């Protein structure tokens, strides 16, 4: 399955390590990572996936595929700037949300619109927006939760 991983473009070392662990876990279980294709969470999750031999897709805000991080296998240039945030959750079967800012929050909103299963690992509280986000505590639990949601 394809799993969209969303999170901030600028992250702490702890947040990067968490994202990398999510990428490793997804790839180890045979899942493809979809993300925004740039830095921060996006680079870390792709780096983790590539370390386990996984496949990564980056949906870029610019018109240039070369702007993808070094760990993206399939860069998709959109030329849409922040509007590309609608495409990241759309192209995953489920979404894992990590720490981030308003861009991540917008992606969470689109995940709700597209009715994607959403799992949160140290991310925004979106219950008031009516988004059914399942909070988890570890990267392994995040992948367990998206797998369970898609089997239901």
What are these language model-derived features?
Residues 1-57:
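Glycine-rich beta-alpha loop segments
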Residues 1-3, 116-119:
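Hydrophobic beta-strand segments of well-ordered beta-sheets in folded domains
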Residues 17-20, 24, 86, 109, ...:
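Amphipathic, non-transmembrane alpha-helical secondary structure
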Residues 33, 56-57, 116-118, 133:
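Hydrophobic anchor at the start of a short beta-strand
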Residues 35-36, 98, 136:
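Active-site-adjacent beta-strand anchor residues
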Residues 39-114, 122-126:
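Acidic/glycine-enriched connector segments
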Residues 75-79, 132-142:
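Short acidic-hydrophobic, aromatic-tinged amphipathic segments that line or gate anion-handling sites
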Residues 90-95, 136-152:
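A charged, well-structured terminal subsegment
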């Amino acid at each position: 399955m394809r799993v969209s991983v969303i999170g901030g473009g600028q992250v702490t070392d702890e947040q990067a390590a968490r994202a990398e662990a999510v990428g490793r876990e997804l790839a180890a279980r045979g899942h493809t990572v979809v993300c925004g294709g740039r830095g921060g969470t996006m680079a870390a999750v792709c780096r983790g996936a590539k370390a386990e031999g996984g496949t990564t897709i980056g949906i870029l805000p610019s018109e240039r595929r070369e702007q993808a991080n070094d760990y993206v296998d399939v860069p998709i240039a959109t030329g849409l700037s922040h509007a590309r945030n609608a495409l990241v959750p759309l192209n995953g079967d489920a979404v894992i949300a990590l720490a981030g800012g308003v861009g991540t929050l917008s992606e969470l909103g689109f995940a709700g619109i597209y009715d994607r299963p959403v799992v949160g690992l140290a991310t925004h509280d979106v219950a008031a927006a009516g988004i059914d986000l399942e909070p988890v505590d570890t990267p392994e639990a995040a992948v367990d939760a998206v797998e369970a949601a898609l089997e239901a």
